[in-house]
Structures are given as structure tokens and as C-alpha cells.
């Protein structure tokens, strides 16, 4: 789950699972959420690298998700949103098929057609899961 509220120059994110929110600002893209997955815990404690996580066979094993238990506490993030920032919300169907640096390049090359281009690239790369992409400019 990934509800977002934007009020003035603030963005409020509620997060559970492995869908992600990124902020693209000028020349970089930063992930604003942290996956609730087994593989993310391995990355966090230094057992595997981010590169190894991308190919890990258990990368879709969630540690926290809606519907798994009766009550789930979401992570809540508050971030600054400034003029010309781009917010990307996406499911793991995108991030499992396209590396972050390539996602950034696709968006920067053609903002107006970025959603179509991202979904096409993810499908061309195998499209193994549902692909959800929302871009806020």
C-alpha cells in the first residue's frame, strides 16, 4: 500500500510492502521508501549487496504487507517537495524489471511519455509481474 498526500511543499507517504516512491530532483533520483522484504533485511545488515539483492531468488518475499496479519503498522515518511521535483510511485513489477539508474534515464529523457516508456521497457525485459507506475510532476 502506498498512499501519498501532498500539502504545500510537503509530501506525506504511508508505506507497507515493496512498492516504492522515488523523488527525482535535478540530477539524481532517491528512493523515499524502504521495502518490507526479506532481501531488504539482508541488504540492511550487510549480508548481501544491493546488486545481489536485485537477482536474489527471494526478493519478492515480504516481511510486512496488507492482508497478512490483522493489524499492520505502515512506515510514514515526510519529505520536502520543491518546484520541478518529480515523484515516481511504482510497483515491484517495474523495479524488478528495470534497474533504478535506467528508470531515472527513461524519465529524464522523455518526461511526457515516461509512463508508457517505463511499462514498455519492463514488459520488453520480461514483464513477470503486474506493472503500476504513477508520476507526479
Language model features by range: what are they?
Residues 6-10, 24-28, 137:
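Short acidic-glycine loop/turn motifs at beta-strand connectors
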Residues 13-15, 23, 33:
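Amphipathic coiled-coil signal-relay and dimerization helices
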Residues 64-137:
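C-terminal catalytic subdomain
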Residues 15-17, 35, 90, 99:
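A secondary-structure boundary/capping signal
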Residues 20:
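An anion-binding catalytic pocket shared by soluble metabolic enzymes
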Residues 34-83:
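Conserved, helical-rich catalytic subdomain that frames metal- and/or nucleotide-binding sites
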Amino acid at each position: 500500500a502506498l498512499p501519498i498526500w501532498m500539502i504545500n511543499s510537503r509530501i506525506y507517504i504511508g508505506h507497507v510492502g515493496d512498492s516504492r516512491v522515488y523523488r527525482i530532483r535535478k540530477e539524481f533520483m532517491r528512493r523515499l521508501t524502504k521495502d518490507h522484504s526479506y532481501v531488504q533485511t539482508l541488504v540492511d545488515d550487510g549480508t548481501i549487496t544491493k546488486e545481489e539483492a536485485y537477482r536474489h531468488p527471494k526478493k519478492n518475499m515480504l516481511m510486512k504487507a496488507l492482508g497478512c496479519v490483522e493489524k499492520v503498522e505502515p512506515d510514514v515518511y515526510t519529505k520536502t517537495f520543491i518546484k520541478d521535483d518529480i515523484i515516481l510511485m511504482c510497483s515491484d513489477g517495474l523495479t524488478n524489471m528495470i534497474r533504478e539508474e535506467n528508470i531515472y534515464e527513461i524519465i529524464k529523457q522523455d518526461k511526457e511519455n515516461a509512463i508508457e516508456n517505463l511499462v514498455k521497457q519492463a514488459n520488453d525485459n520480461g514483464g513477470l509481474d503486474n506493472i503500476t507506475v504513477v508520476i507526479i510532476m
